[in-house]
Amino acid sequence: DFEVFIDPDSDGHNYFEIETNARGVIFDLMLDKPYRSGGNFMVQWDCPGLKTAIHCEGTLNKSKDKDKYWSVEMAIPHQALTMNFNNPLKAGNTWRINFSRVQWLKEKGPEENWVWTPTGRIDMHMPDRWGYLYFVDKKVGTSQDELVYPYNQAIYKLLWAMFYAQQDN
């Protein structure tokens, strides 16, 4: 499957997960906080207005033939992600985001995981370790905007490291 994780206010709480597979089956939910922090998921949240397109070069569930690939496009409406946050799509704002691809290549074998921004574990529910989505208001290729990390990023990373150290003991 392919998974998208979005934390619009970058606080590690009230974030969204949207998954799809090669058949186009959607699984979407909102989490109040990560599972390892005692988080709860809300599967009743359906990403309103979500549009997806799946393209498959090969067959599904026929292990005897050779498949090439499958791809997905998603259009996620901004309005669907406005629950519990106030960080609009405005130049200079950042969101935390990550992408994950999980594939089972061998029967009874372990899954293979690819991610956009590694979290250091096989656990995507670590929003503090996701990448940054930085909004600009300029046309692509017309300027060299530089990503400005949040002013408190060093403290933020230290506090999360302390949190994980407590969780691991």
PLM feature spans:
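Alpha-helix exit/C-cap motif
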Residues: 165-169
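Structural preference for beta-rich elements and adjacent junctions enriched in aromatics
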Residues: 1-163
